[in-house]
């Protein structure tokens, strides 16, 4: 009888250990599934928070030195309307050149929306449509 008991104990313990290992693996898989579900839920971003943070800044610079302030707004993902009507043409041209480089670097866009008025937008702002500018005014004939 001793030999039969040893066989039973040997085989029953092995089955029991295998069962425990299987049980642990199952629990680990279940925990991984729950962790994956939690990760996918945290990747959701509310569209309302994105829409509320969008801003448009209006700036009428008096000197070329203010171009950096405009570029900072663009870097912070804000659209900027720049009115260059009260600045000398040469300085206005330099500002437009500087802002053109800025919007290129951030993947944005710059558009003329009026005589000496420009709309600079970062990559998170889409502008659709176009505005035709009258070429009757002598100042609009000058090339930027």
UniProtKB/Swiss-Prot annotation:
One Pfam family in the UniProt entry: SepF
InterPro entries: Cell_div_SepF, Cell_div_SepF/SepF-rel, SepF-like_sf
Sorted UniProt keywords: Cell cycle, Cell division, Cytoplasm, Septation
One GO term describing the cellular component: cytoplasm
Chief subcellular location: cytoplasm
GO BP, sorted A to Z: division septum assembly; FtsZ-dependent cytokinesis
Compartment annotation: Cytoplasm
Assembly and oligomerization: Homodimer. Interacts with FtsZ.
Function (record text): Cell division protein that is part of the divisome complex and is recruited early to the Z-ring. Probably stimulates Z-ring formation, perhaps through the cross-linking of FtsZ protofilaments. Its function overlaps with FtsA.
Family, per entry: Belongs to the SepF family.
UniProt protein name: Cell division protein SepF
Organism of origin: Geobacillus sp. (strain WCH70)
């Amino acid at each position: 009888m001793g030999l039969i008991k040893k066989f039973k104990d040997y085989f029953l313990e092995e089955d029991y250990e295998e069962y425990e290992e299987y049980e642990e693996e199952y629990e680990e898989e279940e925990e991984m599934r729950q962790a994956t579900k939690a990760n996918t839920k945290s990747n959701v971003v509310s569209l309302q928070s994105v829409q509320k943070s969008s801003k448009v800044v209006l700036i009428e610079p008096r000197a070329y030195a203010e171009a950096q302030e405009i570029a900072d707004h663009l870097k912070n993902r804000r659209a900027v309307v720049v009115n260059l009507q009260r600045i000398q043409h040469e300085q206005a041209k330099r500002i437009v050149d500087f802002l053109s480089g800025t919007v290129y670097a951030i993947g944005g866009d710059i558009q003329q929306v009026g005589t000496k008025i420009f709309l600079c937008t970062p990559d998170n702002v889409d502008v659709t449509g176009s505005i035709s500018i009258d070429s009757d005014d002598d100042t609009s004939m000058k090339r930027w």
